[in-house]
């Protein structure tokens, strides 16, 4: 990079440009020999949903969604559910959150009240307390209205240990955590519900396209559903397909696990309004961000049992087994069998097709 280069929106979009910023500029400065004093089983360099240090699961996320209120949620519910989900997909129980507000001078107290009420409701729904926080106010014009950062911690459970024991009955499994790099050929891929609801509901509302009348964000804390699935056993990896959508999640899994992934378009739930909006806007629902969905990698022998557990929850009612993992010699990257009977490569989006949704 040249000295006069500046940050662009793409640097925060979750795609390749952001990955480059992290790997070239950030990781090199944050890795040092002090790390050796700690038992770090999932590190910053893993770029997973959370890190794990001395058996504590830890994650953080800043929320800059625009507008602050949208169909189905607001920045408050999003900031609570988003961080809980990043902990929950590690297969552990979230213990608590921090919450830090950056507010612009002049922000209406009535709106702040609505947002805080919404955070409280999400926290109660999930059964995860907000334990510590911070509030800063900056001069008018120096931020846009409000940003919220939430961090969260989680702890390992007996169920996670049992889940991994069960995996080991069926195949080799290394390590003690559900990581993006854990997939093996033969594993099945479960998606817990329809894709694109959050991104399209928000975009449509923001731009006035009209689809928001029949569509809401899926923002929801998934910890209870995911804990129930872990109790079934056989799960090797989980991820919430947020920025970059399902396409990004599956490509991360494929790259980090060194496997191919085959999915079937016919099996992927897409709501009619999302389908219609994507047709109109020339977008791919697989690349649109979700805030209340998880992708689960599971040994084939237990895929139906895990699916059944997911479907027992309202938030997982539309879940489906959408594909399976292939050996790289058989298939590289992520490939989808299309409704037309063809095959297409599913790439990770380079940037964010819908900016400012989380
Ligand atoms: Mg995540």
Regions found by a protein language model. Give the residues of each.
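Glycine-rich phosphate/pyrophosphate-binding loop regions near the starts of catalytic domains
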Residues: 8, 16-191, 197
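Short Gly/Ser/Thr- and Asp/Glu-enriched loop/turn motifs at secondary-structure junctions
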Residues: 45-47, 288-293
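Aromatic/hydrophobic pocket-lining residues that form π-stacking "cages" and hydrophobic walls in ligand
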Residues: 83, 119, 250, 274, ...
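Short, Lys/Arg- and Gly-enriched loop/turn segments at beta-strand edges
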Residues: 196-204
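Helix N-cap motif at beta-to-alpha junctions
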Residues: 298-304
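Short amphipathic alpha-helices in soluble, non-transmembrane regions
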Residues: 305-315
């Amino acid at each position: 990079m040249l000295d006069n280069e500046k940050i662009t929106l793409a640097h925060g979009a979750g795609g390749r440009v952001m990955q480059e910023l992290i790997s070239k500029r950030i990781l090199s400065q944050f890795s040092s020999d002090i790390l050796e004093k700690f038992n770090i089983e999932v590190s910053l360099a893993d770029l997973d949903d959370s890190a794990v240090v001395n058996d504590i699961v830890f994650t953080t996320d800043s929320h800059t969604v625009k507008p602050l209120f949208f169909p189905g949620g607001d920045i408050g519910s999003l900031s609570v559910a988003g961080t809980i989900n990043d902990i929950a997909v590690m297969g552990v129980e979230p213990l608590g959150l921090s919450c830090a507000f950056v507010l612009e001078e002049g922000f209406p107290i009535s709106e702040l009240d609505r947002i805080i009420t919404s955070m409280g409701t999400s926290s109660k729904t999930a059964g995860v307390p907000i334990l510590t926080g911070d509030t800063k106010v900056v001069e008018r014009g120096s931020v846009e209205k409000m940003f919220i950062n939430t961090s969260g911690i989680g702890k390992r459970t007996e169920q996670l240990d049992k889940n991994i024991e069960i995996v080991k009955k069926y195949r080799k499994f290394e390590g003690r955590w559900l990581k993006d790099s854990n997939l093996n050929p033969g594993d099945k891929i479960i998606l817990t519900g329809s894709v694109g609801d959050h991104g399209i509901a928000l975009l449509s509302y923001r731009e006035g396209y009209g689809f928001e009348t029949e569509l809401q964000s899926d923002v929801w804390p998934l910890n209870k559903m995911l804990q129930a699935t872990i109790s079934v056993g056989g799960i090797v990896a989980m991820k919430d397909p947020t920025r970059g959508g399902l396409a990004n999640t599956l490509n991360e899994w494929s790259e980090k696990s060194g496997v191919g992934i085959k999915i079937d378009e016919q099996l992927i739930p897409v709501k009619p309004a999302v389908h219609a909006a994507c047709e109109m806007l020339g977008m791919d629902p697989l690349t649109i961000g979700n805030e209340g969905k998880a992708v689960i990698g599971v040994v084939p022998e237990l895929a139906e049992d895990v699916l059944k557990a997911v479907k027992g929850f309202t938030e997982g009612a539309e879940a489906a087994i959408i594909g399976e993992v292939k050996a790289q010699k058989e298939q590289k990257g992520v490939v989808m069998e299309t409704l037309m009977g063809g095959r297409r490569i599913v790439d990770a989006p380079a940037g964010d097709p819908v900016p400012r949704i989380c």
